[in-house]
């Protein structure tokens, strides 16, 4: 039988999602906990592999097990075997053809900036800190050039392995909530470092070091070296993954929950 789980995790505690030798990864911890409950080796497939330091409030995974278990075994049981910083939010049986990765139609990320003079003590690992004042309104104006289907070569990592630089951004907003600036972006898929590279350039616009139309110009130039530095990983969250309705994948509240949406 095939199961799907929704996970949340604090990426600052782990060296990214993907299993690696000699360092702690989210995938390794999840597979070890699931294997204890299944009483058999379990391998998982995730909706999107996050880098070291990147968080998730709604990472979706699927896995196959030979023997059924009650849903509570995959929630409370797995949580009791997971280390601090990783938790299951829900579990359910899914169709055998469901894929957490390939069945997804869109993914949504949030990037959170603490725009304060001094770095925060609480939530410091869950935000990026920029002490210089940022203008969220001009960042929002600039960001609209990225909505739609484009060649995002200017915003992909040099070692990105995707066969195509084209992605379709369905929504991109920048807003200020008190001391926080939230960049919220949805797309059919993302290139490696795409969100953090976009945010890095939006920060430059927010500092009034470049005009809003600079973002569109970067897109047209298709040159990563012309754009700004990659934003830090600590402010990035995978907050939602969308699937066709017939899979009946539950919606989770958008996170991180301390934002209070």
Curated annotation (Swiss-Prot):
Keywords: Isomerase, tRNA processing
Gene designation: truA
CDD domains noted in UniProt: PseudoU_synth_EcTruA
PANTHER family per the UniProt record, alphabetical: PSEUDOURIDYLATE SYNTHASE (PTHR11142), TRNA PSEUDOURIDINE SYNTHASE-LIKE 1 (PTHR11142:SF0)
GO MF assignments: RNA binding; tRNA pseudouridine(38-40) synthase activity
Keyword field contains tRNA processing: yes
A Pfam family reported for this protein in Swiss-Prot or TrEMBL: PseudoU_synth_1
Catalysed transformations (reactions): uridine(38/39/40) in tRNA = pseudouridine(38/39/40) in tRNA
KW Hydrolase (keyword) present: no
Residues noted as binding substrate in the record, renumbered to the chain: 109
UniProt record similarity statement: Belongs to the tRNA pseudouridine synthase TruA family.
Catalytic site: 51
Protein species of origin: Idiomarina loihiensis (strain ATCC BAA-735 / DSM 15497 / L2-TR)
Reported function: Formation of pseudouridine at positions 38, 39 and 40 in the anticodon stem and loop of transfer RNAs.
Domain of life: Bacteria
Summary of subunit composition and partner proteins: Homodimer.
Gene3D superfamilies, per database record: Pseudouridine synthase I, catalytic domain, C-terminal subdomain, Pseudouridine synthase I, catalytic domain, N-terminal subdomain
Descriptive protein name: tRNA pseudouridine synthase A
EC number per UniProt: 5.4.99.12
Enzyme class: isomerase
A GO BP annotation: tRNA pseudouridine synthesis
